[in-house]
Curated annotation (Swiss-Prot):
Biological source species: Mus musculus
Coiled coil: none
Function text: Plays a role in female and male fertility. Involved in distal reproductive tract development.
Keyword Glycoprotein tagged: no
Tissue-specificity statement: Expressed in the epithelium of the vas deferens (at protein level). Widely expressed. Strongly expressed in heart, spleen, liver, kidney, thymus, testis, brain, lung, intestine, vagina, ovary and uterus. Expressed in follicle cells of the ovary, epithelial cells of the oviduct, both luminal and glandular epithelial cells of the uterus, and epithelial cells of the vagina.
PANTHER family: LHFPL TETRASPAN SUBFAMILY MEMBER 2 PROTEIN, LIPOMA HMGIC FUSION PARTNER-LIKE PROTEIN
Protein name: LHFPL tetraspan subfamily member 2 protein
Family statement drawn from the similarity comment of this UniProt entry: Belongs to the LHFP family.
Membrane spanning stretches: 11-31, 97-117, 127-147, 175-195
Length: 222
């Protein structure tokens, strides 16, 4: 018989797992990894002279640059690489692979975590422990990706974004929110991996077993 078990710690772990996967996915697809300084627009009119454009944003896969026309101020946003081989740097290609693998694992864990309220074990293995192990592995992939990412700052696109950019030196560029989100998400991934053990303890406690023995199909312990 299926028992729905909800505890404070298991729900918190589930929510954190979903948040981490979503944050890493959004950061990966964002163009806000490197932010270049705003460049001066050149125009024929007096009003256009000396006008600063929006900053230049460069991500691992995406780019957002301000339109340089005199009239239009819309930004151009999208992926700059039509194929994997067109990614700006070999280091960024490796970063994309490691981050993609890590994010895929996190998304799978986030999906499975929703069903842990109904199913707590498979083949006598705790789902919480298995998911915690997978989150730890995903965190290692994310760390490798984040370590390799600054090594690609010497590529031409990074130099176009900001002068004096070189490996592990952003030059005139600054780091955007996507990099910090990915870094924070990586830290939170390891926290989730450790906290999964607490979720396992909470759902297999004596109080939960007592509720099940009383014939309750819905066990809610906060």
């Amino acid at each position: 018989m299926c028992h729905v078990i909800v505890t404070c710690r298991s729900m918190l772990w589930t929510l954190l797992s979903i948040v981490v996967a979503f944050a890493e996915l959004v950061a990966f697809m964002s163009a806000d990894w490197l932010i270049g300084k705003a460049k001066t627009r050149s125009g024929s009119g007096d009003e256009q002279a000396g006008m600063n454009s929006e900053p230049h944003y460069l991500g691992i896969l995406c780019i957002r640059t301000p339109a340089m026309q005199q009239v239009s101020r819309d930004t151009l946003c999208g992926t700059y690489a039509k194929s994997f081989g067109e990614i700006a740097s070999g280091f960024w290609q490796a970063t994309a692979i490691f981050l993609a693998v890590g994010i895929f694992i996190l998304c799978v864990v986030a999906l499975v975590s929703v069903f842990t309220m109904c199913v707590q074990s498979i083949m006598r293995k705790s789902i919480f422990n298995v998911c915690g192990l997978l989150q730890g592995i995903a965190g290692l992939f994310l760390i490798l990706g984040l370590i390799l990412y600054p090594a690609g700052w010497g590529c031409q696109k990074a130099i176009d974004c900001g002068r004096y950019a070189s490996p592990y030196k952003p030059g005139d560029c600054s780091l955007g929110w996507a990099f910090y989100t990915a870094t924070g998400g990586t830290v939170l991934t390891f926290i989730c991996a450790v906290f999964s053990a607490q979720a396992e303890i909470a759902t297999s406690s004596d109080k939960v077993q007592e509720e099940i023995e009383e014939g309750k199909n819905l066990v809610c312990l906060l």
